[in-house]
């Protein structure tokens, strides 16, 4: 059995250790080869671990950290004051080889900046991108990036994202010759900002990329493409809007039929139908695919939603496990070398 070690920023996110500790124990229970370095304040973490299964604790080590980077801190200020923080120490453990990957629900900008500074981007990559894999209505999966790491992107960055996304779809998701599209306000070639049109022109002439053109936001879940590329501002708004709609939809399904005066048999029928529909669409629940990979780095770094619950954070940990096991950074580096020019 091969040991796999991850470093977790236990203090990051909206709920900190109240989420990360139970999620860690859940992840350890479901994966016997997993070892975790829980980075945070020992005085805060110890009480939450006191009643944990001693067998699980044999594969968990608390690494002390003096501080935590606030979720609303400006990235530049957070990075300057990051020494001794749980996020930075978790990344340093990954950089030094004590861990094979890092998971944090903390400040996205700070995580991006620190990861770029400590872990370093792959050759040929200007800036890493946040990527996730979401389910689509055809029963397949769609790789989407960037989801917020880079608010503004030039055409070169969009092309790099397209290459990384295609590699991810082919090497990890298992899609042969994945289709790649750019997210735009229309499918016509004349639509969109200059950077999008310039990226489209490059991708059309890149034989290694199966570029299919522009898609609009309403195609996010249709399965028309295997990789959808956009800048971080658009990607973040698009994904969170979709997640919000899905959460409301599932919530309405679960609550429908609970009130009002109905015959008993109608209530039973309603609940039966309700369970079937919730089960049918449950895979769209954002908690089931929490965890965005900071793609383009030399090691695995996963960003969890700040508001993740324990189950969702455990999913992010599993995302990191899969990325490490499938050697995502190495596979991307090998493919990038053949497609993109190396940076000076």
Curated annotation (Swiss-Prot):
What GO terms are given for molecular function?
A: phosphate:acyl-[acyl carrier protein] acyltransferase activity
Q: Which GO terms describe its biological process?
A: fatty acid biosynthetic process; phospholipid biosynthetic process
* Annotated pathway: Lipid metabolism; phospholipid metabolism
Reactions catalysed, as given in the entry: a fatty acyl-[ACP] + phosphate = an acyl phosphate + holo-[ACP]
Q: Which InterPro entries match?
A: FA_synthesis (IPR003664), Phospholipid_synth_PlsX-like (IPR012281)
Write the record's keywords in alphabetical order, separated by commas. Cytoplasm, Lipid biosynthesis, Lipid metabolism, Phospholipid biosynthesis, Phospholipid metabolism, Transferase
Q: Which family does it belong to?
A: Belongs to the PlsX family.
Role according to the record: Catalyzes the reversible formation of acyl-phosphate (acyl-PO(4)) from acyl-[acyl-carrier-protein] (acyl-ACP). This enzyme utilizes acyl-ACP as fatty acyl donor, but not acyl-CoA.
Mind telling me what this protein is named?
A: Phosphate acyltransferase
Please give the organism. Answer: Serratia proteamaculans (strain 568)
